Amino acid sequence: MQLLREVDFKQTRCNARDVLKNFRRLERMAGRSLIDIKSPIITDMPKAPKHGNKAEDAIIQMMDIEAERDAILAALMALSLISRQILYYSFCVPDSFSNYRISREVGYSERSIQRMKSEALIEFAEAYKHGRIIAYK
C-alpha cells in the first residue's frame, strides 16, 4: 500500500508553466489604477434596470487578480534561492530570459539551468496553493 499517489511529473510541470505564464498579465492588470473604476452617476432620467453593480464587479475582479498574483509570489518565495531566480527570470520579468541569459545571470551552465528549471517547476507546483496543481497518475 502506498502512502502517496504517484505524481505525473510531466503534466505537473506543464500545469506549473501554465500558472507562471499568466504572471506577467496578472502583474500588468494588478498594477492598473483604481481610477478605472467609476462612481455611479445619479440622474433623474429613467434607465432600464441593470443586473449587478459594475463598480463592485470591477473591484472583485481586481481583488481576484491580486490574490492570484500574490499566490504565485508566495509560492516563489517558498522555493530555494536558485529555483526562485530561475523561475523569476523565466516567467516574471517583463522580458523573459532565455536559458542562456539565465545561465549568465546566475552563473551556471545552460544545461544545468535547463535541468534546474525542470526541478524548480515541480517545487513550484508543490508550493503553489498547497500542491493544488500537482497531477497524479
Curated annotation (Swiss-Prot):
It comes from Enterococcus hirae (strain ATCC 9790 / DSM 20160 / JCM 8729 / LMG 6399 / NBRC 3181 / NCIMB 6459 / NCDO 1258 / NCTC 12367 / WDCM 00089 / R). This is Putative autolysin regulatory protein ArpU. NCBIfam families: phage_arpU (TIGR01637). InterPro entries: ArpU-like. Keywords: Transport. May be involved in the regulation of muramidase-2 export.
